[in-house]
Amino acid sequence: MIKARDEEFVATLKELNPDIIVVVAFGQILPKSILDIPKFGCINVHVSLLPKYRGAAPINWVIINGEEKTGVTTMYMDEGLDTGDMILTEEFDLDDEITAGELHDKMKDRGADVLIETLKQIEKGTAHRIPQ
């Protein structure tokens, strides 16, 4: 397993000099030494309507709490846990009978679409930074 704070990993990323880093379900908070590498930032795809359900298992919490709506959010990463400025959010209604597995699959598809649009906006210089 890759450790985000591993010095060798950070050095490899610096050598690669990426323009942007995209993280999906990584499960680790990126240190400032990584966040500062890409010129267009580090982007996270989070499967909730931030700021609600930051952190782990947002799909499960949405179902446990009986939410009627949920969604996918892209955000610029910062040193906090899902606290960075939001870029795009897509909201949708939930079926009362949806399972975590079904919602995961729906989020995967929606998340890919939102990520593609986010990257297009960043490339054009039109991406917004919406504080949480």
Question: Language model features by range: what are they?
Answer:
Residues M1-Q132:
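One-carbon transfer enzymes
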